[in-house]
Amino acid sequence: MNPVPAQREYFLDSIRAWLMLLGIPFHISLIYSSHTWHVNSTEPSLWLTLFNDFIHSFRMQVFFVISGYFSYMLFLRYPLKKWWKVRVERVGIPMLTAIPLLTLPQFIMLQYVKGKTKSWPGLSLYDKYNTLAWELISHLWFLLVLVVMTTLCVWIFKRIRNNLENSDKTNKKFSMVKLSVIFLCLGIGYAVIRRTIFIVYPPILSNGMFNFIVMQTLFYLPFFILGALAFIFPHLKALFTTPSRGCTLAAALAFVAYLLNQRYGSGDAWMYETESVITMVLGLWMVNVVFSFGHRLLNFQSARVTYFVNASLFIYLVHHPLTLFFGAYITPHITSNWLGFLCGLIFVVGIAIILYEIHLRIPLLKFLFSGKPVVKRENDKAPAR
């Protein structure tokens, strides 16, 4: 069994926070991109589309690697049932809190913005359910996926731990070439599964809950397990924290392939299957790029960094409705895309930080948006003198 490191690995905390906060420029740039979203500017920006595609191509793959790393660390710290309970509470409670407080008002706002309030009563019961599944889960999808992954890893992590007890982990050797082949095969396997579903019963792919619980989990689970293995095997972790020109070049070429597929691919053909193969290996290579960069520049303790590490989840949760509000009611009054993008960042981040500070002063909200029970210090219980 692995001992839990005594020293906090600050660069992983920082990377996870930055990846979370990157969701803000990602969604604001989506307004000004050529991609169709809930709200869009009159004229798309080529550079903001490119910026949006870059973030989208790797962000969540790297995020789930870090999530798997810390999840296995806690797996060794707690008994199995407590581990599952703690992990599910920390992601499930914020998700369930955000649905009535954030995504439901967001959905109602969009119904009015897009003029769909009159057509809602005419939808079938299934269409209403499916629309609500997509719109209420919305940007919270990764929290739902983490709940599913945590439940699956009750069995997976037990198998990994049992196998480690019966083998010598020091003899395990990893190479980026071997990992690249494995993830290429995983990407092809995912593409085959998706294409098979598309042939057999295509409507299921547009089902929101099936997409989140099955397809997203299936795609990101290898990255989650890779993170756990990086915690177990120092050699594997060193492989990611050591800069590699090969990984950087491969990631750049994969991103070009991703852009070409976005530009020339067709959803009725093989666009989504091709994208899954590209982003599977691109995500792996970007783990090296991001980890090595973060290990070199972010591996330190700072009060300012700690603040945003703690605030990142809350800011991410509230940024989405704020972004859509900005896109619906403010974007039409700003003619410049870049000026609108910068104003959007200031608007969303500024209000999100204010809301974060307010929620810190309300114990119930602090618990609901973090999933962590409020622990009173002994000093707080002592009578004043």
UniProtKB/Swiss-Prot annotation:
Enzyme class: transferase
Coiled coil: none
GO annotation terms (biological process): glucan biosynthetic process
Subcellular location, record wording: Cell membrane
Transmembrane segments: 17-37, 60-80, 91-111, 137-157, 173-193, 212-232, 239-259, 274-294, 311-331, 338-358
Membrane topology: Multi-pass membrane protein
EC number(s) stated in the UniProt entry for this protein: 2.1.-.-
InterPro entries registered for this protein in UniProt: Acyl_transf_3_dom, Glucan_succinyl_AcylTrfase, Glucans_biosynth_C
Gene Ontology CC: plasma membrane
GO terms for MF: acyltransferase activity, transferring groups other than amino-acyl groups; transferase activity, transferring one-carbon groups
Pfam families in the record: Acyl_transf_3
Keywords noted in UniProt: Acyltransferase, Cell membrane, Membrane, Transferase, Transmembrane, Transmembrane helix
Pathway assigned in UniProt: Glycan metabolism; osmoregulated periplasmic glucan (OPG) biosynthesis
Main localisation: membrane
Keyword set includes Cell membrane: yes
Function: Necessary for the succinyl substitution of periplasmic glucans. Could catalyze the transfer of succinyl residues from the cytoplasmic side of the membrane to the nascent glucan backbones on the periplasmic side of the membrane.
The family this protein is said to belong to: Belongs to the acyltransferase 3 family. OpgC subfamily.
PANTHER family: BLR4337 PROTEIN, GLUCANS BIOSYNTHESIS PROTEIN C
Protein name, per record: Glucans biosynthesis protein C
Source organism of the structure: Shigella dysenteriae serotype 1 (strain Sd197)
